[in-house]
Amino acid sequence: MVSLLAIRREHPGDVAVPVPYVSRLTQKLQPGQTLVIHGTVNNDAKRFEVNLLSGSSEIGSNSQVMLHVSVRFDEGKVVFNSMENGTWGKEERVSNPFKPGQEFDLRIRIHEDKFEISANHKEIHEFKFRLPYSSIEYFVVRGDVKLKGVHWGGRYYTLPFETQFEDGHLASGQRVYVYGTPKGERFNIDFIARNGDILFHFNPRFKEKKVVRNAEIGKAWGAEEREGPFPFKKDIGFDLVFLNEPYSIQIFHDGERMGTFAHRTKNPGEDYIGLRVAGDLELTGLEFSQH
């Protein structure tokens, strides 16, 4: 069994990192990818910032800053800007949704013509490109925060989307991470068998405010399971984790356990061979992990 504390990190590669945090990107960012920063704001925080730069990780007289995000507790604002050849552009401001002493989740998604910025899974701003994103070389976080994890990944997905698990199956102890934003009345995440059976059907339904769990084996649906919370909200992003344990699949939403589904297959360490995602969902990331 894996404890809830072991699940709370929402990404398989998350580790605590020092601040300031400086990363030189080894690959160019691509549209559809998301930069994720999460941690805890210091109790006495005044400001922290995130910068996407080229040429140097430091802001100087000749800097190129494609995106500057300044979270200001002393002003109650989040300020967005860019810098070209050492000169700041025009600021764009929104209210600051973060609080001193609390956990935060800040995400920057790259699109063809803009950055989409979300705070605690809710979009707060779109920043149109002023400089080409393709020249971004550095990703820097500074200021009054403690970082629990920094990573980037994802892509654009067309639904329905289907993929096989690495090594051909989902072994006991492995996890599936699904990142997305609900956009309509329902979506589903299905764990598939080799013969096409749906061994686990995960189906949030907004009109009913229920998460329906079931299995379709031999073209026959079994008994629905509907108990438990409904934590989803339209247009609010989520991180889901599905943990394959010997007797059940444990389900976590944004780090909190939301339910379990007892296996309806004889060999759960071998029988889940793939995943299918469909419905009214903007899928932003999908990952598999041993731990």
What are these regions (language model features)?
Residues M1-S118, K122-D239, L243-F252, E256-H291:
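Peripheral membrane interaction modules
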